Amino acid sequence: MALWGTSFGGGHVLATAAANPRIGAAIIQNPFVDGRAAAAAAMRSAGRVATYRLAVRALRDALRARRGRDPIYVDLVGEPGTVAMMTTPDARAGFEAILPPDPIGWEPAVAARIVLHLRSDRPAAKADQVTCPLLVSVCDHDAIAPPDPAIRVAEEAPRGELSRYPIGHFDLFAGEWLNRVCADQIAFLRRNLIAVVQ
């Protein structure tokens, strides 16, 4: 079995692969692997005022959760300086470009309390525990999931491989880059998973 994850899901795949030696291969692309680095990048993009407002909402939401009340949500993406999870200049346009034309029944928002846990989320610390082949696909101009921690994951994982692309976080989800990334990931799976099974 192979695991695949992108962005925040990439961090979950890394942690799962580190905890389960039965995984045959894993691929993480533009992965969120270091909460401290991602939080610093997010604060630079959002600015002080929006970061403060996001923190206040997160604390209020955490208190509401303790009392069993409905969550306070924040948008997943927004323009720089707004209260949202991703506010880089490319975030809103990049995110909207990958959505289906009419995503029925889904609101791109999360419970604000997640902000309180992001800095301590560091799946990169488990890279040396990943025993399966691991492909780390990194976007060199990623302002959401900083590339340097992901590059270190590829270096520290015993069977890590690194693919780098001169693009931003959302650029690998469409067009030429999608085709290139998919070709690299399929080749990785053929080498490390399918060839082993045959």
Label for each model-derived stretch:
Residues 143-149:
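Conserved alpha/beta-hydrolase "acid-adjacent" motif
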Residues 167-182:
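Catalytic histidine-centered segment of alpha/beta-hydrolase-like enzymes
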Residues 108-126:
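Active-site nucleophile elbow and catalytic-triad environment of alpha/beta-hydrolase enzymes
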Residues 12-97:
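Alpha/beta-hydrolase-fold enzymes
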